[in-house]
Amino acid sequence: MAVEKDQQKDAEAEGLSAATLLPKLIPSGAGREWLERRRATIRSWGSFVDQRRFSRPRNLGELCQRLVRNVEYYQSNYVFVFLGLILYCVATSPMLLVALAVFFGACYILYLRTLQSKFVLFGREVSPAHQYALAGGVSFPFFWLAGAGSAVFWVLGATLVVIGSHAAFHQIEAVDGEELQMEPV
C-alpha cells in the first residue's frame, strides 16, 4: 500500500512537471521527441532578454554575423517565441477559436466513430486519411470566415520581425578559439 502511494506521488510529480511544460495532447512520437529536444536545448531566458546585451551592429558584416550566430545559438528559444505568437493569435481571435474547435471536434468525432466501426460512405469504406480530409473540408468555410489566412501571415510576419530584431541587435558572446585570426602573407 505504501509502495503504491509512493509510486502514485512520483507519477503525479512527474505528470505535473510534464503537464506544465509539455502538453499531454501531443502524442508520443516524432513531434513529441522534437519538442522535448527543443525544450532540452533551450538557452537561459535571462540572457535571451538581457537588455544590456542589445546594441546596434557597427557594420553589415557584424549584422550578418550576429544573425547567423544568434539564430544558431537561440534556435530553441525562437521556436518557443513562434509558438507563443501562435497562441497569442489564436487566443485573441474568437472566430479562429471557433473554427479550430469545429475542426478538432470533427476529428474527435471521427476518431470515436472509427473505434466503434469502420466508416462507410455510399457503400465504400473510407480510410482515416480521407475522413480527416473530409473534416478539414467541412471546417474550411469556418477557417475562411475566421480569416485564418491572414492570421498565418500575421504570425509569420510578427515572428520574422521579433526574431530578426532580436538576432540582429543581441550581442554575441565571444567564444574562445572563434576569434578572427590573422595569418601572415
Curated annotation (Swiss-Prot):
Keyword Isomerase recorded: no
InterPro entries to which the protein is assigned, alphabetical: Prenylated_rab_accept_PRA1
Membrane topology of this protein: Multi-pass membrane protein
Ranges of the Cytoplasmic topological domain: 1-78, 113-131, 166-185
Subcellular location(s) of the protein: Cell membrane; Cytoplasm; Golgi apparatus; Cytoplasmic vesicle, Secretory vesicle, Synaptic vesicle
Region (Required for interaction with prenylated RAB3A and VAMP2): 30-54, 175-185
Ranges that cross the membrane: 79-94, 95-112, 132-148, 149-165
GO cellular component: Golgi apparatus; plasma membrane; synaptic vesicle
Domain of life from the UniProt record: Eukaryota
Residues covered by region (Homodimerization): 175-185
Annotated keywords: Cell membrane, Cytoplasm, Cytoplasmic vesicle, Golgi apparatus, Membrane, Synapse, Transmembrane, Transmembrane helix
Claim: Acetylation is one of the keywords in the record: no
Region annotated Required for interaction with GDI1, chain positions: 165-185
Family: Belongs to the PRA1 family.
Quaternary state and interactors: Homodimer. Interacts with VAMP2 (synaptobrevin-2), prenylated Rab proteins, GDI1, NDRG1 and PCLO.
Function: General Rab protein regulator required for vesicle formation from the Golgi complex. May control vesicle docking and fusion by mediating the action of Rab GTPases to the SNARE complexes. In addition it inhibits the removal of Rab GTPases from the membrane by GDI1.
Protein name listed in UniProt: Prenylated Rab acceptor protein 1
Record gene name: RABAC1
